[in-house]
Amino acid sequence: MVAVQGICYTAGVELMLNADVVIASEDTVFGQLEVLRGIMPFGGATVRFVQAAGWQKAMPYLLTGKTFDTQKANELNLVSEVVEKGKQLERAIEVAKEICIAAPLAVQALLASATDGVTLGHTVAFDKMDNYLKPLFESEDAQEGVRAMLERRLPQFQGK
């Protein structure tokens, strides 16, 4: 979870691209300026920026160091949500709390499976999915989730 505001250049963008959820203030300015310094992004932007935005959308910014605003970052799929200036941290905490309501084992498995899809390809990710599902279905949290649904109450997950 990341909340960004103000100027988010180079390493800031690289850190942001490593996050699962990015909440951006409407006034943020982004840029991968490395090519203007004689180097290239080395924290993953050459992969993650392209992966999020697509080759044709990412390259003009990576190859030139041109900066862009929050609206463009949203269009490029680099941020999850844009909020009013000054509300980014509050909103990030709200989203984090929403995630914390979910079963921790399920969240961990979901992130691992999604990462498999991105890093190993969808075929391998589908093949590995049972490795995540079997322990989940056998977990106390899965039993609690079903009970809570039948009893029409919020589940109380324990990460077991």
Q: What residue spans do the PLM features occupy?
A:
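CoA-thioester-processing core
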Residues: 3, 9-63, 76, 91-95
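Short, basic/aromatic-enriched C-terminal tail that caps enzymatic domains
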Residues: 145-160
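Glycine-rich phosphate-binding loop at the start of an alpha helix
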Residues: 10, 43, 67, 86, ...
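C-terminal long alpha-helix characteristic of the crotonase
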Residues: 23-28, 70, 79-127, 134-140, ...
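Hydrophobic alpha-helical segments typical of transmembrane helices
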Residues: 45-48, 57, 69, 106-109, ...
